[in-house]
């Protein structure tokens, strides 16, 4: 829109005051904002309005524009993602209270920050804790103790932070709200922003005679130990909530919660995938050929596994119900056991003869391996 007249875009005269320019901008910004106006061309018009305002509300840019036109401010216009809504334009509305301008008009009461009475009971903060447990404890469950530090209500003052016989007084700077309202000039006009009161630090009250035990905080840091009942079947990374085991609340508010994340040590014998357990077990060539009944380890103890005759390498067998318990009951997962057939590296002459006959009886043939240089030399020296 380099050829567009910025004054015409905003609908103001060339001698318009800053207040008139800001007023015109707010009106047009609300009219063409893409979150509110979905008509074709509205977004482009919104960008033009922002580009015009970006130049005309700045005295230096406006003077350059009046003298040289758009060439005088080339590359300085634009609004940096204005078509993305107010969040995309770089505004953080979380720190604003009563806007009293474009934000309040567009979004209504929803754009106003909800004030919380700092003197009312407030729930304590939640805490996070990581508990590392053994593999088998995760399978079978276990009771254990967990110790950690947390802020607890001061027993001396009962949590109000004051010496016995005294009481907090309302902050005379924020009048008990815990926040101060600051008015600032912006491209959108005057915006009121709320900040934490620097006199009472957001508490809304002043403690003239602080408790000697807690120093006026109302809480003291202490070690807390609880008994944790680890449920059978807990998985790696799962998190459980323990109600009321977090930080102390303020002004008599309830304690927060403790969230324990479980980290499970690996096992050298078992691999867990969900509710199933995976293992490997070696068997001999004879067991695979003739069949056998073997004993295998499971997470619940030893179990019998029947190896049928003619079992092939890497055959998988499923042991029903020998896996991980489901947290909500309803039985267990399975154990999948893979058999690895172990080929002997050394056999005696009798075993070699028996195997050769076995192959010949089956119609097969074995080609003897050619002797190496050192074996031939050894035979020659020995007269063979």
UniProtKB/Swiss-Prot annotation:
Outline the residue ranges of the record's CR-type zinc fingers: 141-223
Hydrolase is among the record's keywords: no
Where in the cell is the protein located?
Cytoplasm
InterPro entries of this UniProt entry?
Answer: DnaJ (IPR012724), DnaJ_C (IPR002939), DnaJ_domain (IPR001623), DnaJ_domain_CS (IPR018253), HSP40/DnaJ_pept-bd (IPR008971), HSP_DnaJ_Cys-rich_dom (IPR001305), HSP_DnaJ_Cys-rich_dom_sf (IPR036410), J_dom_sf (IPR036869)
The protein's name: Chaperone protein DnaJ
Q: Which family does it belong to?
A: Belongs to the DnaJ family.
Gene Ontology MF annotations: ATP binding; heat shock protein binding; unfolded protein binding; zinc ion binding
């Amino acid at each position: 829109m380099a050829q567009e007249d910025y004054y015409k875009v905003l609908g103001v005269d060339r001698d318009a005051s800053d207040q008139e320019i800001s007023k015109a901008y707010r009106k047009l910004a609300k009219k063409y904002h893409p979150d509110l106006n979905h008509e074709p061309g509205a977004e482009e018009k919104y960008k033009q309005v922002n580009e015009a305002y970006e130049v005309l509300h700045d005295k230096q840019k406006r003077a350059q524009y009046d003298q040289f036109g758009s060439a005088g401010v080339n590359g300085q216009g634009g609004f940096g993602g204005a078509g993305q809504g107010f969040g995309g334009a770089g505004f953080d509305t979380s720190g604003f209270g009563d806007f009293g301008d474009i934000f309040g008009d567009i979004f209504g009461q929803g754009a106003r920050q909800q004030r919380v009475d700092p003197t009312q009971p407030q729930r304590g903060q939640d805490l996070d804790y990581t508990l590392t447990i053994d593999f088998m404890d995760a399978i079978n469950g276990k009771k254990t103790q967990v110790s950690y530090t947390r802020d607890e209500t001061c027993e001396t003052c009962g949590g109000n932070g004051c010496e016995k016989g005294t009481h907090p007084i309302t902050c005379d700077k924020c009048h008990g709200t815990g926040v101060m309202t600051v008015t600032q000039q912006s491209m959108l006009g005057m915006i009121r922003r709320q900040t934490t009161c620097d006199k009472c630090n957001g508490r809304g009250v002043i403690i003239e005679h602080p408790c000697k035990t807690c120093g006026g905080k109302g809480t003291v840091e202490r070690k807390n130990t609880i008994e944790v009942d680890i449920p059978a079947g807990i998985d790696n990374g799962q998190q459980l909530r323990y109600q009321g085991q977090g930080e102390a609340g303020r002004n008599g508010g309830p304690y927060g919660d403790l969230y324990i994340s479980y980290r499970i040590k690996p096992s050298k014998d078992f691999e867990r995938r969900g509710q199933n357990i995976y293992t490997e077990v070696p068997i001999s060539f004879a067991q695979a050929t003739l069949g056998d009944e073997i004993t295998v380890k499971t997470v619940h103890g030893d179990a019998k596994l029947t190896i049928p005759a003619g079992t092939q390498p890497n055959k998988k067998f499923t042991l029903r119900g020998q896996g991980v318990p489901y947290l909500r009951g309803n039985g267990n997962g399975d154990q999948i056991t893979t058999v690895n057939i172990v080929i002997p590296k050394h056999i005696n002459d009798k075993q070699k003869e028996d195997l050769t006959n076995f192959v010949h009886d089956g119609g097969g043939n074995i080609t003897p391996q050619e002797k190496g240089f050192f074996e031939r030399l050894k035979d020659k020296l020995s007269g063979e």
